[in-house]
Amino acid sequence: MRIVQLSDTHISHLGGVPADNMSLLADHINHDIRPDLVVHTGDVVIADPDSRPDRDAAKALLARIDAPLLVLPGNHDVGESADDPWQDLPVTSERIAAFTSAWGQDRFLVTGSAATRSDDWVFIGINSERLGSGLPEEREQWDWLADAAGQARGKSVMLFLHKPLWFPTGSQSGITVPEADRERLVALFADARLRVVSNGHLHRFRRAFQGEILAVWAPSMTFAVTADPGRGLEGESAPGIVEYRVEDDDVQAELRQVPGTGAVADVLAMPEFTAALAEIESR
């Protein structure tokens, strides 16, 4: 089974590099990879969770992907669950509702041989911004996760979300999910085999093991972030996607770059981003 993970596309209704890259990626997925499943792990839109034009532009571009597509939110899609949310844009019930109105869901569970070609794996996606938010939606997602963990009992699990569970320099607000939520989440799958945790958010590609769990960071399709090992930013910054090959009990995760795509190193030099930032600051 082939799964493609893309992340941090940061699409704007103004077009530019994000739209150009997404168009090339859709063609590459359709003609060269032909995966069984595509998962977007968030930051679909460029910056503003309240921009309907950006959501509409993202929907139009992602609709070009032929394979089954599941979309999870990032902090730029629904606001942030953090002590000091970016641009004072916290996650809210209204922002979650706007996301689910556009995409139909902010979590998923894929299981069964018809969907996965194997009864041995369960693929689960969650909204990382619900974690630690204190919203009613957080409690509702925990209840759903408890049921999902029950369905995954005795099986291998691949978990997708926007923010990482682990970071080389430890848990950090705005970078990782809260430590207590990470521990609760991992404990939920004690009767399953949590094999892979796949996130975005950090705009870098990295594979590392946390015990027996493979933790994969997916790079951004738009932005390149300079390595800074002292701050925990390890791995590769090249724009691209992660291709997973799942067969029986084995899973492989590889960075795959998309021909013709470019990366933005200085976000403030990107007119689509500065326009979104100006709109946020004007409110």
Predicted segments with their positions:
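N-terminal active-site segment of His-dependent metallophosphoesterases
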Residues: 1-61
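A cross-family glycoside hydrolase active-site/sugar-binding cleft signature
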Residues: 7, 41, 72, 160-162, ...
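Active-site environment of divalent metal-dependent phosphoester hydrolases
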Residues: 12-15, 46-50, 75-83, 131-134, ...
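Short aromatic-enriched loop/helix-cap "lid" or pocket-rim segments at secondary-structure transitions
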Residues: 17-18, 81-87, 170-174, 209-212, ...
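Binuclear metal-dependent phosphoesterase catalytic core
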Residues: 23, 188, 205-283
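His/acidic metal-ligating clusters that form di-metal
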Residues: 27-38, 122-124, 133-216, 270-283
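Extended active-site neighborhood of metal-dependent phosphoesterases/phosphodiesterases
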Residues: 50-151, 156, 181-190, 211, ...
